Amino acid sequence: RLDGVTGVQTCALPILQASIINAGDGCHAHPTQALLDIFTMKERKGRVQGLKVAIIGDILHSRVARSNIWGLTKLGADVTLCGPTTLIPVGIRNLGVKVTHDLNDVLGTSDVLMLLRLQKERQQDKFLPSIREYARVFGINKEKLKKAKKDVLIMHPGPTNRGVELTADVADGEYSVILEQVTNGVAVRMAVMYLMSGKKTAE
């Protein structure tokens, strides 16, 4: 795991005689998080292909968003990114996703609402006018959830900022699968380590 550093594992591959598991490198990728997220969707919805997934928040700095975009589009999901203009990367549509800056565009149509953690540094770095304004426009609360599908899944890679990305009653509510993501993460990462140890099939 390399916070703030991108691509070290790629440089290391030619000189190491070992498998490398990327547990998160800078803003680039977080493959095991995407695997557990997709596993959770499949477990709950029975499929990934055709699901409408909205990824909401700081896409620009999110390795979780990038890995989920790659995985979900590969498996046939319909992915829409939603967030402030300043936090959506230029050219991101080239990855086969839609982009909107209006939460209402995704609230009523999405099967999954995946919220991303917003770091306080984004306000300090002038990406946002204020955290409070972000929460007002892009945060999910019970009132906004009334517009969502009755079987929508609320996901978050953690740690959450309660009162920013989502309110406490949403995080702990009936639509939230955040704790399931954590539980599934143990099994998924165990499976990755098992396969990387040289085992190709489950015994």
Regions found by a protein language model. Name each.
Residues 38, 43-116:
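Glycine-rich phosphate/diphosphate-binding loop of Rossmann-like nucleotide-binding domains
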Residues 9, 15-17, 75, 93-95, ...:
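Short, structured coil segments at secondary-structure junctions
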Residues 19-23, 30, 55, 81, ...:
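General beta-strand structural signal in soluble alpha/beta enzymes
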Residues 1-11:
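Single conserved hydrophobic/aromatic residue that forms the stacking wall/gate
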Residues 92-169:
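Rossmann-like adenosine-cofactor binding region
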Residues 151-203:
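Adenosine-phosphate binding glycine-rich loop
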Residues 8, 25-26, 84-86, 118, ...:
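Short, ordered loop/turn segments at secondary-structure junctions
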